[in-house]
């Protein structure tokens, strides 16, 4: 037998021995423990109520009577108290509570004051209580409210939206001119008396014709005559005096149901400061 040459020898690596067989259960993970059984009745236990959110308005800073007024937000509410007792503070806290804690929208609130200064102070107080939360809310005087309404719908009463507002001096000047044109002597019929009677009639919703019919004194008759001419001239000039702003707005709301519905739908909460000073038309 021929011997293989040296370079023909098998130089392959030796074959390693076969691994020992491993039991099958060595690869099986240990079984997880059985879960504990939970009694069924724990799912029926009452869920604790969430803690109420802290009010945005510091109600605790109010006395019991003030707190009751602030928290009474539905239905009519009349606050009777002496001067300096905090009525305006209650009013502003009540509005802030509605906006900040109850989710009332700013445009649903109308707050009325008697002076521009009081309106500005109320806006400042509300801004301090709820910063950036009063946009769209009306905080104004009766006359300013009426101007806003009339600017939008005065055409329904025969005016244009750009009507002129006569201040006290303008009105007095026009009454003086009318008295001169009618030959009414100011010495016998003082202009302030004439204007006062006309203003009272307007705020009682009495027109010049009705005033003349019911006049039972020379003063009332002269005032009614001036009143009639004053109305004619104001209409011709597309103008209103301060009394007209109130009277025409009331006329608008009484004679135009669609306008009344619009504002009733918008203003869900109306607050009036110094309500005891309001007159009939207000």
Tell where the protein language model's regions lie, with residue ranges.
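N-terminal pre-P-loop "Q-motif" helix
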Residues: 59-74
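Short alpha-helical elements of helix-turn-helix
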Residues: 64-67, 93, 280-281
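A basic/glycine-biased coupling hinge at the interface between accessory DNA-binding modules
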Residues: 2-12, 16, 21-30, 34-57, ...
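Walker A/P-loop
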Residues: 74-94
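Charged catalytic and DNA/RNA-contacting regions of genome-maintenance
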Residues: 273
């Amino acid at each position: 037998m021929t011997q293989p040459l040296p370079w023909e020898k098998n130089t392959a690596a030796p074959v390693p021995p076969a691994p020992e067989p491993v039991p099958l259960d060595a690869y099986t993970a240990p079984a997880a423990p059985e879960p504990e059984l939970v009694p069924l009745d724990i799912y029926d236990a009452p869920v604790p109520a969430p803690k109420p959110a802290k009010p945005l308005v510091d109600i605790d800073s109010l006395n019991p009577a003030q707190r009751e007024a602030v928290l009474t937000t539905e239905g009519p509410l009349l606050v009777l108290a002496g001067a300096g007792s905090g009525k305006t503070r209650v009013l502003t806290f009540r509005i802030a509570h509605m906006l900040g804690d109850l989710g009332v929208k700013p445009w649903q609130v109308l707050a009325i004051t008697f002076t521009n200064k009081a309106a500005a102070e109320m806006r400042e107080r509300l801004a301090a209580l709820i910063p950036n939360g009063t946009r769209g809310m009306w905080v104004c005087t009766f006359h300013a409210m009426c101007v806003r309404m009339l600017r939008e719908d005065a055409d329904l009463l025969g005016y244009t939206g750009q009507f002129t507002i006569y201040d006290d001096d303008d009105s007095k000047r026009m009454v003086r001119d009318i008295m001169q044109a009618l030959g009414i002597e100011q010495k016998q019929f003082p202009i302030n008396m004439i204007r006062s009677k006309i203003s009272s009639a307007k705020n009682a919703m009495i027109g010049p014709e009705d005033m003349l019919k019911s006049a039972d004194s020379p003063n009332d008759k002269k005032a009614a005559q001036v009143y009639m001419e004053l109305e004619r001239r104001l209409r011709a000039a597309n103008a209103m005096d301060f009394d007209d702003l109130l009277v025409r707005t009331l006329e608008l709301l009484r004679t135009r149901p669609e306008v009344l519905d619009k504002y009733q739908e918008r203003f869900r909460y109306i607050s009036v400061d110094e309500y005891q000073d309001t007159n009939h038309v207000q």
